Amino acid sequence: MSFQVLHLIGGGEIGGAEQHVLNLLKNFNQQQITPHLGCLVKNSPFASLTRSRGIKTTIFPMRFPLDIGPVIPLISYCRTHKIDLIHCHGARAALLGRLTGKLLSLPNLSTIHSWPEFDYTSVWKGRLALFLEQKTQPWSSGIITVSDALQTTLRSGTKPSFPLRSKTIYNGIPQYDFSEHQIMRSSFRQQWGIKSTQKVIGTIGRLHPVKGQIYLAEAIKALSQVYADLHLLIIGDGPLRSELQNYLTANNISYTITGYYPAAWRALPAMDIFALPSVSEGMGLVLLEAAQAKVPIVASNTGGIPELFNHRREALLCRPADSESLAAACKEILDNPDLAKVLTENAWQISKLFTIDRMVKDTTNFYLEILTDKG
């Protein structure tokens, strides 16, 4: 018997959560789990991607953040396709999925990829998202967090009277092919007009305050006084793009902002350092990709990041929201090739532990635990 599982996600961008969902959908054992996908954004780029990969995807468009109108077509879909379980990703999906589950007496669970309070540029929207997350938790059959740090935060805000079923399941990534590392390095540098002699500090992610790219820009400004051939490579797009461009241009910093780039992992060999300056981070899927590419890593010591890497063993971890700490860590790697080599080798070994097979197996077992209890 194969259980029918509907995954719900906003799908307005293609970030770590979307990549996580895609990896799950492509790798479930179809004899156990038949996955369905629903996106909540009308012109969803993620839906376009999944459809191009042959994944059946349905749009349940939300007209505004608290629009519960899609619950009606969701109920119809669940009945028609005999859905056994709804798996929600993100605050909006959790609101609709939990409400649909409650109305149908249908099991539902959520994966918390990042803390909802920090997912919005607006403070009040973040607080509202957190309020709704906590108020609708009693409607949930279970919650997955992608790090123990998120698990701790989750439980600290949960009422003791609510018997929360929750589990940490770490993200997994495919084994990417970096065998032509030098060719990839030269190709992407040429594509973006980066000189072969330049030292490149790069990052990948949505351009959002929680990702802390402004602190990386400030660090590069300081480092540019020491290294004349430094270049900042930012792969991603988002609401902070104009602000970052204005800052970098005003300070005469050599930089490239590519915008959204599919399969951005391929560009990692173009970097001499990968930096993740997040203010808050659930886990940091891209860190595992950088580790596979054997690019030295500098990252904020926040959220689930120190669960992946130890400071000075696999990466240099710095204080979040601190450009001076970030600059000092980057400088240490630039000045010490032997340290960089040790860090990359150790991080590469760690990255091999975070497989998709393990993530899919743990997720499937959690489904079965919930569905067995229901039965």
Regions found by a protein language model. Name each.
Residues C39, P296-A299:
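Short hydrophobic beta-strand element within catalytic cores of glycosyltransferases
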Residues G15-N23, K199, T203-A222, P239-Q245, ...:
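A conserved mid-protein helix/loop that constitutes part of the nucleotide-sugar donor-binding site
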Residues Y260, V279:
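Aromatic "clamp/platform" in nucleotide-sugar-dependent glycosyltransferases that forms part
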Residues C88-L96, I112:
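Short His-centered aromatic/hydrophobic patch
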Residues Q190, S325, E332, L339-L353, ...:
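A short, well-ordered alpha-helix in the C-terminal region of glycosyltransferases
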Residues P138-R165, I173-D177:
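A short, active-site helix/loop in glycosyltransferases that binds the activated sugar's phosphate group
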